[in-house]
Regions:
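Extracytoplasmic/secreted envelope proteins and their assembly/folding machinery
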Residues: 94, 98, 144, 148, ...
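A generic secondary-structure signal for well-formed alpha-helical elements
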Residues: 105, 155, 178-182, 278
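Surface-exposed patches in mature extracellular/periplasmic domains of secreted proteins
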Residues: 107-117, 159-164, 182-190
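Short alpha-beta junction capping motif
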Residues: 58, 123-168
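N-terminal secretory signal peptides that target proteins for export/translocation
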Residues: 1-7
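An acidic, glycine-rich "communication" segment
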Residues: 33-40, 66, 70-73, 166-248, ...
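Aromatic-Pro/Gly-enriched surface loop or interdomain linker
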Residues: 27-128, 134-135, 246-249, 253-281
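Bacterial N-terminal signal peptides
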Residues: 10-22
Length: 281
């Protein structure tokens, strides 16, 4: 039923996205691969479309982690070389959501992800940007400025997989650099982002894979999920904050029979709604 409903709308969506992002796609950088924190071995085989210029690809934010002296994890090497917080769930999560986009929408989407470095201006190639474990990021002043410019020009940033009071404080410190004059608010149920494709009034906490061991949907002191955001002056949502939940794991484990289907289903629906919202607003 959803697919039929979506296909009726998709002609306008696809046409609109072609107008908005068709010119941008001509300047997209080639695919870059990095060793991931969970998946350190680079894939040997890539799909045929891995270098195709498309309307959308899973654009994953690269960022410097919080210093170990302030409680950050100790990593070997530079965050610019992978195996840092920004690579959590990468690339499996990215490719599962990309497969859902290709299967359930008419958006011209690539099968593989694209790591994005704010220091190089990559963000302007993509209308939708995803950041994971942002309770561990520490943006520089220049990176915050680059993010602000991207968002005010029409970009969209979705962040996910951080939990509890301490991680929120680290997240908010860097986001305050991006928008010192804009508040973070709870997104109301009536916001179009919850009704772009799916009606998502009935939302619940989506846990990470740790749920399979603990049977708890929360981590640390983050017992209640929050869908928060930052709006521009025209009431467009620029930043969608998925706090005290782990949508990335729900995508990553969508094909794991032990991970409950209801969590993957909601996680994918939220991801698709946010993506289509980003490409049409």
């Amino acid at each position: 039923m959803f697919l039929l409903t979506y296909l009726r709308r998709a002609g306008a969506v696809a046409f609109g996205t072609l107008l908005l992002f068709g010119a941008v796609s001509a300047f997209q950088r080639p695919l870059r691969l990095y060793p991931g924190f969970e998946y350190p071995n680079l894939p040997k085989d890539l799909p045929r479309d891995y270098q195709e210029k498309t309307e959308w690809a899973f654009a994953r934010l690269m960022y410097p982690p919080v210093s170990p002296r302030y409680g950050g994890a100790e990593f070997l090497g530079s965050w610019k070389q992978g195996e840092s917080n920004w690579t959590m769930d990468y690339p499996r999560s990215d490719r599962h959501l990309s497969a859902a986009v290709r299967r359930l929408t008419r958006v011209h989407a690539r099968s593989v992800e694209q790591p994005v470095d704010l220091d190089e201006g990559d963000q302007f190639d993509w209308p939708w940007l995803y950041g994971v474990e942002v309770g561990h990021w520490e943006l520089t002043d220049d990176q915050a400025k680059a993010m602000r410019e991207y968002l005010l020009r029409g970009g969209f940033f979705m962040c996910d997989d951080f939990h509890g009071t301490i991680e929120w404080s680290f997240f908010a410190a860097s986001m305050q650099k991006v928008f010192p004059d804009r508040p973070i608010v709870e997104i109301p149920n009536k916001d179009p982002i919850f009704h772009t494709i799916y009606d998502l009034d009935d939302r619940y906490q989506v846990p990470g894979a740790l749920y399979l061991e603990t049977h708890r949907t929360y981590e640390k002191d983050g017992k209640e999920p929050h869908w928060r955001g930052i709006y521009d002056d025209r009431n467009r949502l620029m930043v969608a904050i998925c706090f005290d939940m782990d949508l990335g794991d729900s995508w990553e484990h969508a094909d794991n029979p032990e991970y409950p289907e209801k969590f993957s289903a909601l996680g994918l629906r939220i991801g698709l709604n946010y993506l289509i919202y980003a490409m049409t607003h």
